[in-house]
């Protein structure tokens, strides 16, 4: 079955949301593609139209978390313009830590990020390696 552009976008968002939930509650190793596809209502074969592997989906989740954390830090820095740099940095770090605690994402990062990065193709890691510089310059 072919999906419309709208359906594709909605299913991609649903896969990301469900994967993030599973990353925190079950972990990457205990989460299966079958489980994810059933949760969003697509056939297992359709999964590969969205992501080439389970690892690439979990990597997309990790990248989303990464981008959110930069946003949290940036927001904290923008709210503390008048403070000394050390206080601004401390507030940004605390804001990021609070977000990690509130979302439970630290569980995924602590338990699965290293293994996930080991399983990714070198080309993928090389393309995304310099993303921090991109976030910082924005």
Where are each of the predicted segments found?
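Basic, helix-initiating cap at the start of DNA-binding domains
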Residues: 1-26, 33-39
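Amphipathic alpha-helical segments used for helix-helix packing
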Residues: 88, 98-123
